[in-house]
């Protein structure tokens, strides 16, 4: 009997143990990442040919202590390699692990190689050659602390390489994992199986091979035992012949069918080729179509199973489309696949929540470095009076109500950008803004006391409901997560897409960027203030400080201002402001743009203006500013500087976003200024719920 080890993906060890025992293995012992077992030569070949779950079959050769590189060399050389190698066999060494002595795996592999070669030359035998690409023998060495384990990899290449897949195509899951997913799905061979996002067809091909009793190793052309001196070719040929006989019989007797579809025509063609190479092409129908076109291929029965490894996203901006995809799949399953089973394998359990289905079972497994989950569902048969479940129903109802009221108002006002929802319901803590036919969801970061997974699932529900209520495609929904404003976070760069959208606001055309920054380039709550500035600007010299993207300057220019001066510290936003001005035909000397620290510029400027708009940050300590600024502490000093630039009879419109801001009226009076609060006049219906989003004042000489 040989002591052997079968490795597998984390989470599949018990499944592999059961498989090996069915093949005849004895003494099976599960460890993390594999199973130790015992078997004769025939069982070695049986496990290589028939295991659908093992990554490799390893024959341990020995262990040695490694306190120096000489210890490694001598420990490897102590093995009688001349009785392991066939004459003329090539070999390769795979070395993994490091310790204080062996600090480089390539160096460790070289010492092992030298020890094996020297074992031959010292006996005056021809030295074996190294072949890193396709060796006859593959020697594996694992170094764990001071112990090196030396073994012969009888698989050669990993057993997931069945021989049917075109190696040029990337596979999101290995064939061994795909086989495990099929086994855990609850699908019964002989019943229909459908994969609506099949990619290159791995799940369906593995299922078809299992169902037709086709050995996973039948199409492999190279093994790791061809140079092994103890290889028994006669037994191997018997195992191979038996596998061929069973495959022919299984295919001839199988009567059910498999269905695969994908939106990518290229991968569907690859799937067809893979299935043909696997010998089961006639059993699988592949079609080019997306999930939106999915329908039950057997509406009159029998019931079957839908299985898939749907896409998941690593980037925030991919989530709306994925949530929509999962939501659509869930609805389609309930509408068309009553009585069927569904099994999905995913690296994002939260996305599976968008199905709005309750799982009966779930399993965990590793897909490379990713922690994944497989969930199995039974789809209840629908009845005529069944009501479809609504995602985030309270939120959806409120959004629908707001949309009905605000859409009509916005159309009458001539505006395309407005707030649809602003944390109206505490449990749905987001803001939803409309920009033409786009929507932006801003999630306010939940407090640390809220369970992160529940918060993420709630956000996914919000996205699904928003897409449904607004009826927009997923690629026109932008998702952002923001904390309550903290200083300069407001202008943080988020992306590099550089995609601008032209929108209208009354008679102005403006550029917004929905993806690259935390804000979009247009503060919606200042909309009425901008319109008022336009109405006040005719024939006047207008100054816009802390101008951001210059939208107030655009309104002033369109209102007939004699000149506009736009000042901001950011070159990016000044270039944006210039684009906004040009879009509205406002260019030339009458419309100046100045890049400067606004507070420093204000103290040094000696010009006069009739109308000044200033919307400073609540607090700033930017390195590019000469000093820190606090709007509550410093607003009187700010007004003193502004008064110096204000022409007789002129007006300052002063706005800020500090909650609870208190205007120092006495301090202003000492400067000879009066302040009229106009906050309520500048709040539009879409911000009616948030009366403290800003405060706004008109300040004039007494």
UniProtKB/Swiss-Prot annotation:
Annotated GO CC locations: cytoplasm
Domain named THUMP: residues: 43-154
GO MF annotation: an example: rRNA (guanine-N7-)-methyltransferase activity
Entry's localization field: Cytoplasm
Pfam family membership, one: UPF0020
EC number(s) from the headed UniProt entry: 2.1.1.173, 2.1.1.264
Domain of life of the organism encoding this protein: Bacteria
Signal peptide: none
SMART domains: THUMP
Alphabetic keyword roster: Cytoplasm, Methyltransferase, RNA-binding, rRNA processing, S-adenosyl-L-methionine, Transferase
Gene3D superfamilies assigned: 3.30.2130.30, RNA methyltransferase domain (HRMD) like, Vaccinia Virus protein VP39
Keyword Methyltransferase among UniProt keywords: yes
Catalytic activity: guanosine(2445) in 23S rRNA + S-adenosyl-L-methionine = N(2)-methylguanosine(2445) in 23S rRNA + S-adenosyl-L-homocysteine + H(+); guanosine(2069) in 23S rRNA + S-adenosyl-L-methionine = N(2)-methylguanosine(2069) in 23S rRNA + S-adenosyl-L-homocysteine + H(+)
Similarity annotation: Belongs to the methyltransferase superfamily. RlmKL family.
Function: Specifically methylates the guanine in position 2445 (m2G2445) and the guanine in position 2069 (m7G2069) of 23S rRNA.
Protein's name according to its UniProt entry: Ribosomal RNA large subunit methyltransferase K/L
Organism annotation: Salmonella schwarzengrund (strain CVM19633)
Lineage per the UniProt record: Bacteria, Pseudomonadati, Pseudomonadota, Gammaproteobacteria, Enterobacterales
